[in-house]
Amino acid sequence: MINGTGPMHPASPLTTAVFSLGLVLTAGLGPAHAAGEALLLIEADSGKVLKAENATYPWYPASVTKLMTAYVTLSAVKEGRITLDSPITVSPNAAAQQPTKMGFKTGTVVTVDNALKMMLVRSANDIAVVLAEGVAGSVDRFADEMNRASARLGMTQSNWVNPNGLPADDQVTSARDMAILARALLVEFPEYNGYWNIHAIKLGKRIIRNTNSLLVRYPGADGMKTGYICASGFNVVASATRGNRRLVAVVLGASSSAVRAAKAAYMFETAFNSNGLNWLMPSSGTVYGLQPINAAPPNLHEAMCGKQRRRPAAEAADEDEATGSDEQGLASVFSGAKGYGPK
């Protein structure tokens, strides 16, 4: 049995922070890579765009792919094809996936509910395949379902070939598409909001903490998923709520997990304090109106994992594990920021 938990420790002063762009750039976290980043902030209820920068450039999704895996899985539950209690089995193919993973042996049986928790908290690549095979019978058939769902949602820049986001040239998305997906999850499946906000899971005596540091460091953060491979840089799709207003932020291609979290938090904080006005974008419309750019996705492998990087990140390792001391860098951003009280 896997138990999901809320915060693992009381809120500290680090969790009440305001971000400034200057602070992020001077916190010793390293400059943004030459290819830039993709940034997008929308209102979850309306889809209104509050900020967009490179939001329609194609990008490698890495583990934010798992949000689409969750969407297809929850759709199958809604359709009655499976239930959250349905048993699914770890196949040899699932067990052979690269880290990050749970590492279960072939033949291990888990429920759909527990598999979703492990995939979303641990970012377990093996469990994403377990879900795919359990829902559709094979990874290829599940990828077909992912692509059909993308087409139905209007995610015109996305193509999926696997359920976990491990490196694949043909697996692409954009900040626009990921914001559309995040909004669909929140609007279509409000009863499953708890999946995006699990701070940690307990497996036996083992405590596994969520890779999304915003959940315990930014007040009001309540989802959703991080991602990293060398080609993509550090990605996050995040949500946060203050009062009755919920926002979705997408950051693709950040130079570290610390920068990724800080930029998402900065967008949240700026928007929450803007009295509902668009931030520097008075006529940006909704996320569905953003025009896709026809281009190849940037490949950040050299910038993220090349020899010139002081601490090259590992290709197969996911999230904060890939950067070792990035969490210390993130702490320096928070500790240097001004405090504020909830609105």
Q: Where in the sequence are the language-model features?
A:
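Secondary-structure junction/capping motif
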Residues: 10-14, 111, 138, 256, ...
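A general, composition-driven signal for non-globular sequence regions
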Residues: 7, 25-27, 60, 254-257
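Hydrophobic alpha-helical context, especially transmembrane and signal-peptide helices
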Residues: 11-13, 34, 38, 98, ...
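Domain-terminus/edge residues, biased toward the C-terminal soluble/receptor-binding domains
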Residues: 155-159, 163, 167-172, 176-343
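Bacterial N-terminal signal peptides
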Residues: 16-28
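Hydrophobic alpha-helical transmembrane segments of integral membrane proteins
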Residues: 13-15, 63, 220
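Bacterial N-terminal signal peptides that target proteins for export
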Residues: 3-18
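Active-site-adjacent loops and short helices of periplasmic peptidoglycan-processing enzymes
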Residues: 26-176, 186
